């Protein structure tokens, strides 16, 4: 089911992206005489995308050609989107600048997006460590609690066991007291997840996990089975107390308000210690106040991942990236350590967060 949706989506995006690019370029060069010629460009591109997808399906193997072909194809789509964006920007410029050599313009349209895409492919491989701190009067320890947050790992065709090993190295280097994974640990990889997550066994502190939308494509019992074998504590509609802090996990597919109401009514969300909510998709902290939530840790947005998604996301989400505050309630959004669909990022970084909880004087 999921593979079929991805297949149709890739065909559509591939065809429309490159069709749009070629139509714009040829229109700019005044090579089109009739509208019918524009449609004639789109059709073969869609067919090409269809056959590329068929190749991918028949070579489906995590160790073989599938991963390489998948990465290559979606990288081409990412490049096409960048070309399309730069085409649109350039056409806007030409509306203001009357005299410009068309071949210079074409060189800019083609060359700049390629460099931009190379940058977008490299930058996610350089993981940023972001440190933030929060203080709470009910946190009684003189020693700050160090929480390492991972989000949106997206294990699959692009990110596999070697990537987990890199993450584990980062965890060990930063020496946290506890690790939390706020969703989308898996992409297309649950069947091999146990072996890929094996490096996490080197981490000797608790690892909490709550499911994101990609994790929810699978049966919950299967996700629990794989994570439990990897020393990961699956936390959904429940709490976990550790070193003077109460962690609350709610899966992406659960009714958030109903789940928090039930936990509060059952006496599991008292304000005697800080309550930290692990939630994949970010929520406005204003909506969390009444449940005694001090801090919500989220991901999901990827901070837009590709331009212009960085701008569109700010319309879609109340809290897109970093810290949002309402009174004494906070939401912190991690932009993710992995990425989805396109193995690229622009105007944003792959990130691991170190969150320190301190005593408020």
Features from the language model and the residues they span:
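Non-catalytic terminal accessory segments
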Residues: 1-125
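N-terminal signal-anchor transmembrane helix
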Residues: 66-70, 96-150, 156-173, 192
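Soluble catalytic domains of enzymes that build or remodel membrane lipids, polysaccharides, and related
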Residues: 139-361
């Amino acid at each position: 089911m999921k593979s079929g949706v991805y297949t149709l989506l890739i065909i559509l995006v591939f065809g429309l992206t490159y069709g749009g690019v070629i139509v714009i370029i040829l229109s700019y060069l005044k090579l089109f005489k009739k509208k019918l010629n524009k449609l004639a460009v789109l059709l073969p591109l869609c067919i090409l995308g269809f056959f590329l997808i068929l190749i991918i399906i028949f070579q489906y193997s995590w160790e073989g050609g599938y991963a390489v072909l998948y990465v290559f194809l979606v990288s081409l789509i990412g490049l096409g989107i960048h070309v399309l964006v730069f085409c649109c920007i350039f056409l806007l410029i030409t509306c203001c600048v009357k005299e410009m050599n068309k071949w210079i313009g074409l060189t800019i349209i083609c060359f700049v997006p390629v460099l931009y895409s190379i940058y977008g492919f490299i930058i996610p491989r350089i993981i940023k460590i972001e440190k933030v701190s929060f203080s709470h009067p009910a946190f009684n320890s003189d020693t700050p609690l160090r929480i390492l947050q991972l989000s949106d790992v997206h294990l699959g065709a692009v990110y596999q066991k070697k990537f987990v090993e890199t993450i584990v190295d980062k965890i060990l280097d930063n020496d946290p007291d506890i690790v939390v994974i706020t969703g989308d640990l898996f992409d297309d990889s649950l069947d091999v997840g146990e072996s890929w997550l094996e490096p996490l066994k080197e981490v000797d502190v608790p690892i909490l996990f709550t499911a994101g939308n990609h994790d929810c494509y699978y049966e919950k019992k299967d996700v629990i089975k794989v994570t439990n074998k990897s020393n990961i504590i699956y936390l959904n509609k429940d709490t976990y107390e550790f070193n003077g802090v109460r962690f609350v996990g709610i899966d992406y597919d659960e009714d958030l308000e109903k789940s928090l109401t039930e936990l509060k009514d059952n006496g599991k969300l008292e304000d005697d210690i800080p309550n930290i909510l692990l939630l994949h998709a970010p929520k406005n902290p204003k909506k969390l106040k009444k449940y005694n939530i001090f801090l919500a840790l989220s991901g999901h947005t990827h901070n837009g991942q590709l331009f212009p998604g960085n701008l569109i996301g700010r319309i879609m989400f109340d809290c897109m990236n970093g810290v949002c505050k309402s009174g004494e309630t906070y939401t912190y959004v991690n932009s993710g350590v992995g990425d989805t669909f396109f193995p690229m990022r622009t105007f944003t970084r792959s990130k691991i967060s170190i969150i320190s909880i301190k005593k408020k004087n």
